[in-house]
Curated annotation (Swiss-Prot):
The lineage of its organism: Eukaryota, Metazoa, Chordata, Craniata, Vertebrata. SUPFAM superfamilies: DHS-like NAD/FAD-binding domain, Thiamin diphosphate-binding fold (THDP-binding). The keyword Magnesium applies. Its cofactor is Mg(2+); thiamine diphosphate. Homotetramer. This is 2-hydroxyacyl-CoA lyase 1. Binds 1 Mg(2+) ion per subunit. It catalyses: a 2-hydroxy-3-methyl fatty acyl-CoA = a 2-methyl-branched fatty aldehyde + formyl-CoA; an (R)-2-hydroxy-long-chain-fatty acyl-CoA = a long-chain fatty aldehyde + formyl-CoA; 2-hydroxy-3-methylhexadecanoyl-CoA = 2-methylpentadecanal + formyl-CoA; 2-hydroxyoctadecanoyl-CoA = heptadecanal + formyl-CoA. It comes from Rattus norvegicus (Rat). The modification N6-succinyllysine is found at K361, K368. Pathway: Lipid metabolism; fatty acid metabolism. Optimum pH is 7.5-8. Mg(2+) binds at D458, N485.
Length: 581
């Protein structure tokens, strides 16, 4: 009896630690650096504990934006960011960010508070089957069974998020576990998980791929964001230059090899895809972005060489001639070695190169002609050509919107890998400001002086516009360009809008695509202490952007009015499903 009392007294005298602090320490041990979230019951203590250990916490205004930001950190750094949310509705708001991370194959950890375990099935505050709900949107979804179990679950979540094809993972933390105290000696932290193992393709398959590429009459390399994530820029650029091959980047593959490289045929995209006879896919999937690899966008007998980290991705939609399973950078080096040992170069004077150069020149001329129009309001091309003239070559470009993103991608150049973030594989609107905040936070430490330019359509800006307050609160010198056409796809000018309002019943007469004309979005920025500009002419755009780039002490929003009916130049093929409107 006395021994028992002595043991109990000893336990009480031992140093205690809360579940919140165990979570924070486990994250720190796994080299997690960034956390984004919206705090409240029961997760506030977790954010405070994380800050005590030096984990950077960025408080956002909406869980979706927080989740988008955390996922972008994962893409930019290769280590998952954490999204911290409250239970029930807070977690549900983050599901969009989890799905987006999974679709883009970006590492992400979502930590969600949940109702107390002893209230399960009783109708507890914000009770929801969170672990089950997150399984559809994640690689791994679990709830620690005890405080002692937390380090194990966190290590597994971090490891799962970065191993194989990266993706989202969810950790559910009941409210009672956050505040529960346990002896520090009972907690065993897991060692930091090792970097993902690098997998190489089979040597015979690499030789076969080199042979197919050597036999090509009209070759093309397609560089995807998987190549950017794996840091394959050096090996792919060497392959491009050694073999004199034309390449085409996907939207977030831009910058792996600079857009101004003479072998870039982005301006001849449709022609390159339609007539290539051998295509090498570097971490690019044959999904909707690449038109599934099917006719009429491609030749029926085109040969694909597919390089991907994920075996399940190989052969989707089209049977490839050669599959190279492995890390994109490692496999690119293997392929490069084949041509270093046995040099081969695609002839510069070939008919294929002549066709691509001519199409590239013609398309660039059409865009420049549209950009040179002096009429007001401005069109998209005029805006983007003036922006491109002033953008620093090392800046991050974040972009979302319909025409704003599609046209901007063709004009705004990327010269560095992992410096473009956009709607991505899921085509998600609302990612812009979250992505921009993530890029600015990462750049502040890893590449000081690099600016973040966030190019938003006016409709897209509306999804996460209140994150401007977050930007100002943390004084992130982000430049937001809102390309304002008064609508979704297209809008109306003030005169036409006034006539519409003369009809009775605005809910039945205002077209669904229309937004309020001449909205002063720049005042959202000035309301929180940043700088704002309302511009209507090329001269005003040039002056405001020049001032914004010069001032690194404050964020800025430039509200750029354009022709409400402005659209893209004529396309050879429709980008997505045709609309009957």
């Amino acid at each position: 009896m006395s021994e028992s009392n002595s043991a109990e007294g000893s336990d009480r005298s031992e140093e205690q630690v809360s579940g919140a602090k165990v979570i924070a320490q486990a994250l720190k041990t796994q080299d997690v650096e960034y956390m984004f979230g919206v705090v409240g019951i029961p997760v506030t203590e977790i954010a405070l504990a994380a800050q005590e250990l030096g984990i950077k916490y960025i408080g956002m205004r909406n869980e979706q934006a927080a989740c988008y930001a955390a996922s972008a950190v994962g893409y930019l750094t290769g280590r998952p960011g954490v999204c911290l949310v409250v239970s029930g509705p807070g977690l549900i708001h983050a599901l969009g960010g989890m799905a987006n991370a999974n679709m883009n194959c970006w590492p992400l950890i979502v930590i969600g508070g949940s109702s107390e375990r002893n209230q399960e099935a009783m109708g507890a505050f914000q009770e929801f089957p969170q672990v089950e709900a997150c399984r559809l949107y994640s690689k791994f979804s679990a709830r620690p069974s005890s405080i002692q179990h937390i380090p194990f679950v966190i290590e597994k979540a971090v490891r799962s998020s970065i191993y194989g094809r990266p993706g989202a993972c969810y950790i559910d933390v009941p409210a009672d576990l956050v505040t529960l105290q346990e002896s520090t000696t009972s907690i065993k932290y897991k060692e930091c998980c090792m970097p993902p193992p690098l997998s190489l393709a089979e040597t015979s398959a690499v030789r076969a791929a080199a042979s197919v590429l050597r036999s090509a009459k009209q070759p093309l390399l397609i560089i995807g964001k998987g190549a950017a994530y794996s840091h394959a820029e050096d090996s792919i650029r060497k392959l491009v230059e050694l073999c004199n091959l034309p390449f085409l980047p996907t939207p977030m593959g831009k910058g792996v090899v600079p857009d101004n490289h003479p072998n870039c045929v982005g301006a001849a995209r449709s022609r390159a895809l339609q007539f290539a006879d051998v295509i090498v896919l570097f971490g690019a999937r044959l999904n909707w972005i690449l038109h599934f690899g099917l006719p009429p966008r491609y030749q029926a007998d085109v040969k694909f060489i597919q390089i991907d980290i994920c075996a399940e991705e190989l052969g989707n939609n089209v049977r490839p001639s050669v599959t190279l399973l492995g890390d994109v950078n490692a496999v690119s080096k293997q392929l490069l070695e084949q041509f270093v040992k046995n040099p081969w170069q695609y002839p510069t004077d070939s008919k294929w190169w002549e066709t691509l150069r001519e199409k590239r020149k013609n398309n660039e001329a059409v865009s420049k002609e549209l950009a040179s129009k002096k009429s007001l309001p401005m069109n998209y091309y005029t805006v983007f050509y003036h922006v491109q003239e002033q953008l620093p070559r090392n800046c991050f470009i974040v972009s979302e919107g319909a025409n704003t993103m599609d046209i901007g991608r063709t004009v705004l150049q990327n010269y560095l890998p992992r410096h473009r973030l956009d709607a991505g594989s899921f085509g998600t609107m609302g990612v812009g400001l979250g992505f921009a905040i993530a890029a600015a936070v990462v750049a502040k430490e890893r590449s000081p002086g690099q600016r973040v330019i966030c190019v938003e359509g006016d409709s897209a800006f509306g999804f996460s516009g209140m994150e401007v307050e977050t930007i100002c609160r943390y004084n992130l010198p982000i430049i937001i360009l809102v390309v304002n056409n008064n609508g979704i796809y297209q809008g109306f000018d003030a005169d036409t809008w006034g006539k519409i309002l003369n009809f009775q019943g605005t809910a039945t007469t205002i077209p669904p695509m229309c937004l309020l004309p001449n909205s002063h979005y720049e005042q959202v920025m000035t309301a929180f202490g940043g700088k704002g500009y309302f511009v209507q002419t090329p001269e005003e755009l040039q002056d405001s952007l020049r001032q914004a780039l010069k001032d690194t002490s404050k964020p800025c929003l430039i509200n750029i009015m354009i022709e409400p009916q402005s659209t893209r130049k004529a396309q050879d093929f429709h980008w997505l499903t045709r609309s009957n409107i």
